[in-house]
Structures are given as structure tokens and as C-alpha cells.
């Protein structure tokens, strides 16, 4: 492990946290090695294709490649034009009356590195899919943590804010203010929480929709809503979806897609939910051989983790 990884390990308070962090490092390293292998294989394949194209070109044929024939890309498409189009859609959304989305990040700094990194990646996809939408929402980050942590989080996990030409589009703003302070007490504001008693149904009429950026394990969203004195609602998943397998958790890009579709279709939650929930959650795991194998592998990993925890605790006693 690197020096930085050892430092993070020492920061972890419990053995379970340490093991979780090591698992995160192992998964990250495996992905990196797979990516490097794919890139190496791709480079070798490209070299072979280029050699074949060079042979065709030398023989007087239509060989494509450097210093040979070239395919001309669409001259009207460039990153600046794409950024300007995305920014213009966000600007139009500011004046359309659509709900503003308040992404509450007050808990992110307290999380372990694995969870904060995962949520950062989800925020990246959330911003990307919002840009791609025909009718995007205006996104804002509220209850922003310390500047030092925020800069590191954006750089390592979220992206966008550290890229080129970010001045050409409209990215979500950051504020240390709470939701009501940021949007004003007169705004019709609601908060999404899977632990809320009330159910959100019908057309979206709120001015502001608060969404807590957490993994949802400790009822943080409901606590945040109560502290801010904002009424909390849960999505009507139980009313319209027969969730058959896996944890009932929607990633943030999916939540945003559901809200956007409901706003556009006038309140058809059933269609919006079914369009944005992975089909694997709608199939009974007992009827799916692949699910059975995944379940067995997961149980094996859990048993290995339990044995490792016991071994570490035994070795560190006394």
C-alpha cells in the first residue's frame, strides 16, 4: 500500500472500517489493472489495424490512418459548442418554473473515503445526465463542507469543476447556507427521505426539492429535514413497484431521472419508476440462477470478512 493508504488506515477508528477501506483499495486496484490491460490490448490491436491499413494504402487502396486517408468528423461539433448548448438549457430551466434541486452535502466530509468517493462519482453522473436531458433541472449544492475538503472531493471524485472550459457552461453552485436560507423561507420546499412517513405522489408542484447526499444507512435525510424544519416525503416505490430482490436503494442519477420524468409527464410515477429502476430488482432472486450465484459469492465474501476480522482482533489482543 502507498503511504497515503497507510495514513487513511490509521485514521479508521474500527477494524471493520479498516477492512472496508482495504476492500475499497483492492477493488480500485483491480479496476485499474483491468483498465491498463484493456488499454494495452487496445494499443496492440490498433497497431495491427494501422499496419494493415498502411499495407492497403501502399498498394494504392483506401487505407485510413495518419498520413493516409482520413475520416472527417462533424465540423459543427466541438466541446465549446457542446458546453454552450448545455449551459443554455440550464439557463432556460432557471426561468421555466421547474423545481430547483438542492443537493445537501452536509454529511459528506464525515464519511469514510469509500462512501465519499462513491457519492462523488454519483454526483458526476447526476450532473452529466442532467446536462444530457432535454429539460434539465437547476442543481445546487447546499450545506457545503470546508473548502479544503470540498476542493479535494471535487478533484478526486466529482470532476467537472477541475476540467477545461468550465466557464463555458453553468455548473451547480455551492453554498454553505442551508436550504431555507439559500432559497428563502417563502419557497415551497420538500425533502426526499426513504424513512419519511408521508408519500410523494401526483404532479411535482414544489419550488425546491431537497435531496441528502448520503448512502442512507443512518436516516440522515430525515434528520436533516427535521433540523431544517422541512416536510419530508418518500418516493412512492411501494405503491407502484413490486421490488423483488436487492436492497431498495436508488442511486442519485436514477432519483433525478425519476423526478425529471414525473415533472414532464404530469405525475405518472409508475412509468417513471419502472423506466429508471434496474430490472434486476424486479426479478425474484430464487428464479434467477445468476442471482443465486451472486448471493452465494456474497455470502462467501461475508464469511471471509468475518474470519479476517476475528483473526485481526485475536492477533491484536494483549
UniProtKB/Swiss-Prot annotation:
Residue ranges of domain SAM-dependent MTase TRM10-type in the record: 86-284
Gene Ontology, cellular component aspect: mitochondrion; nucleoplasm; nucleus
Heme found in the keyword field: no
InterPro entries found in the cross-reference section: MT_TRM10-typ, MT_TRM10-typ_sf, tRNA_m1G_MeTrfase_euk
Keywords associated with the record: Methyltransferase, S-adenosyl-L-methionine, Transferase
EC number: 2.1.1.-
GO molecular function: methyltransferase activity; tRNA binding
Keyword DNA repair among UniProt keywords: no
Biological processes, Gene Ontology terms: methylation; mitochondrial tRNA 5'-end processing; positive regulation of mitochondrial translation
The family this protein is said to belong to: Belongs to the class IV-like SAM-binding methyltransferase superfamily. TRM10 family.
PANTHER family: PROTEIN CBG09110, TRNA (GUANINE-9-) METHYLTRANSFERASE
Protein name: Uncharacterized protein C56G2.3
Amino acid at each position: 500500500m502507498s503511504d497515503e493508504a497507510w495514513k487513511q488506515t490509521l485514521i479508521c477508528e474500527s477494524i471493520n472500517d479498516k477492512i472496508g477501506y482495504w476492500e475499497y483499495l483492492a477493488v480500485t486496484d483491480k479496476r485499474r489493472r483491468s483498465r491498463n490491460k484493456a488499454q494495452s490490448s487496445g494499443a496492440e490491436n490498433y497497431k495491427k489495424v494501422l499496419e494493415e491499413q498502411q499495407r492497403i494504402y501502399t498498394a494504392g487502396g483506401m487505407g485510413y490512418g495518419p498520413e493516409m486517408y482520413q475520416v472527417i468528423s462533424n465540423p459543427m461539433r466541438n466541446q465549446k459548442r457542446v458546453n454552450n448548448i448545455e449551459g443554455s438549457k440550464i439557463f432556460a430551466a432557471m426561468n421555466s418554473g421547474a423545481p430547483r434541486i438542492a443537493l445537501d452535502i452536509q454529511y459528506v466530509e464525515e464519511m469514510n473515503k469509500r462512501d465519499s468517493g462513491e457519492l462523488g462519482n454519483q454526483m458526476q453522473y447526476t450532473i452529466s445526465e442532467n446536462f444530457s436531458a432535454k429539460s434539465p433541472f437547476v442543481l445546487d449544492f447546499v450545506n457545503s463542507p470546508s473548502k479544503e475538503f470540498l476542493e479535494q472531493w471535487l478533484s478526486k471524485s466529482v470532476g467537472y469543476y477541475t476540467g477545461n472550459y468550465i466557464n463555458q457552461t453553468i455548473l451547480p453552485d455551492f453554498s454553505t447556507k442551508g436550504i431555507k436560507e439559500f432559497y428563502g423561507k417563502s419557497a415551497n420546499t420538500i425533502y426526499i427521505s426513504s424513512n419519511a412517513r408521508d408519500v410523494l405522489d401526483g404532479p411535482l408542484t414544489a419550488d425546491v426539492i431537497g435531496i441528502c447526499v448520503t448512502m442512507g444507512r443512518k436516516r440522515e435525510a430525515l434528520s436533516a429535514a427535521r433540523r431544517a424544519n422541512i416536510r419530508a416525503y418518500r418516493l412512492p416505490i411501494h405503491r407502484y413497484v413490486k421490488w423483488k430482490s436487492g436492497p431498495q436503494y436508488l442511486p442519485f442519477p436514477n432519483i433525478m431521472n425519476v423526478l425529471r420524468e414525473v415533472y414532464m409527464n404530469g405525475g405518472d410515477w409508475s412509468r417513471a419508476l419502472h423506466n429508471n429502476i434496474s430490472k434486476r430488482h424486479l426479478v425474484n432472486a430464487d428464479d434467477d440462477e445468476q442471482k443465486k450465484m451472486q448471493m452465494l459469492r456474497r455470502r462467501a465474501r461475508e464469511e471471509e470478512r468475518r474470519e479476517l476480522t476475528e483473526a485481526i482482533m485475536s492477533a491484536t489482543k494483549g
